[in-house]
Design a protein with these regions (language model features):
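Long, contiguous internal "core" modules enriched in hydrophobic/ aromatic residues
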Residues: 6-182, 197
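...captures the hydrophobic TM-helix bundle architecture rather than a specific catalytic motif
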Residues: 16-33, 187-194, 239-247, 251
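Peri-membrane helix termini and adjoining interfacial loops of integral membrane proteins
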Residues: 45-47, 70-71, 207-217
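Membrane-interface capping segments at transmembrane-helix boundaries
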Residues: 174-181, 245-261
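Short, membrane-exposed interhelical loops at transmembrane-helix boundaries
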Residues: 209-231
Length: 280
């Protein structure tokens, strides 16, 4: 099997396309479920199918209990992860569409920055259209989530919501002007603010229960021990600069634009014309 085999290429193109769509959609669904809350209960590990009453749940005994997803999976392996992804609602599904649309806009702006010729023209043309759809979907999702599922972090969530909205609008305006670099920058900031909004909505929890607030998993309950936090902090101090360093270096090394023009040393039989975005 090689790149010359059409069936082999087609099979992997299909797999790559499906995977590329599934990742942002499922990530958005997970975020939506986290914000809205999941159908989880706290059960005593000695009798895992017997619910602990909300009045009996506190930090002291929660450490001896288990959080169960309540979607009929029981003790099925990875049931909590599955409930996060498939125990969805209309809000969670909208979250999947939002993340997918934001990813499309980000990709279009990035293509406009990294390509030349016809490819760049197509990316510049499609970016504002995708940006308009993305902005509308994000606005509905964020306003719905902020006011329907507000908690203790409402004020911070509102601040991040406003910042994300401003950045999305500015990004959209730059996209319509063809200023791809500025559009990409502000869309990136908007995505960062959106992530901050999600965790502000969760505060002071890391996982909310839609059945009863007493069943929610709080930051205090899920935090690591002091020793573990020290190890993690030291590791972060050492590794984060390294990661940032090689990321900046790789971006700098690959700063040139990609063109469909023939490149010296590239074997002609490795180019597949007429079957990808580069040639339409």
């Amino acid at each position: 099997m090689c790149i010359r085999d059409r069936q082999w290429r087609g099979r992997w193109d299909t797999i790559q396309t499906i995977s590329a769509w599934l990742v942002p959609v499922l990530l958005g669904v997970a975020f939506g479920n986290l914000v809205a809350g999941m159908k989880i209960i706290v059960a005593d590990p000695k009798t895992p199918f017997v619910e602990v009453g909300p009045e009996n749940v506190d930090i002291a005994n929660a450490g001896m209990s288990q959080i169960h997803s309540f979607i009929g999976l029981g003790e099925f392996p990875f049931s909590q992860l599955l409930s996060l992804l498939i125990g969805g609602s209309g809000f969670a599904i909208l979250g999947g569409l939002v993340i997918a649309s934001l990813s499309l806009v980000q990709g279009a702006n990035f293509l406009a920055l990294k390509t030349d010729g016809a490819v760049q023209e197509r990316a510049v043309a499609i970016a504002p259209k995708l940006g308009l759809i993305s902005t509308i979907l994000t606005a509905v999702f964020a306003v719905w989530g902020t006011f329907a599922f507000k908690g203790d972090g409402f004020l911070f969530a509102l601040i991040f919501l406003v910042l994300a909205a401003v950045c999305l609008i500015v990004s959209l305006l730059f996209a319509f002007k063809g200023a791809s670099a500025k559009a990409f920058t502000f869309n990136s900031i908007a995505i960062a603010m959106a992530v901050a909004w999600v965790f502000a909505m969760l505060f002071p929890n890391v996982m909310k229960s839609s059945i009863d607030p007493a069943y929610s998993l709080t930051i205090a309950q899920s935090s690591a021990s002091a020793g573990t936090q020290i190890v993690m902090t030291v590791a972060a101090i050492i590794l984060v600069p390294i990661v940032l360093g090689y990321t900046i270096w790789s971006v700098y090394m690959f700063r040139a634009r990609i063109s469909v023009a023939p490149a010296g040393g590239l074997e002609p039989d490795k180019i597949r014309e007429g079957a990808n975005f580069l040639v339409g």
